[in-house]
Regions:
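Inter-domain helical "communication" segments and dimerization helices
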Residues: 1-95
Length: 96
């Protein structure tokens, strides 16, 4: 189930607005953790466009979930790139 802010009577619009906030926060956090600024903002903008094109609540939630997964993966990649060779080898060995 989605989180329905009480600001609007339109559930889909409220969820879209909430998703936009989530995408912005994810982009900012990703940049703080080392993701390329341009890539973070372009991804955010693409997710917002996809979010606006969604016509049902499940579609909006799917776009939001895909954004969360995308930024989580990108943050993970960024973190692994900054590991020392020894730590990288250990992470690869244990399969993280």
């Amino acid at each position: 189930n989605g989180i329905i802010p009480s600001v609007s009577g339109d559930t889909i619009r409220s969820e879209k607005n909430y998703s936009i906030i989530v995408f912005e926060k994810l982009a900012q956090t990703s940049i703080t953790l080392g993701m390329d600024i341009i890539e973070a903002y372009q991804s955010r903008d693409a997710l917002i466009q996809e979010n606006e094109l969604a016509v049902s609540l499940p579609e909006v939630l799917k776009v939001r979930d895909s954004g969360i997964v995308y930024y989580t993966k990108e943050i993970g990649k960024t973190k692994i790139e900054h590991l020392s060779p020894l730590i990288s080898s250990v992470v690869q060995f244990i399969g993280l």
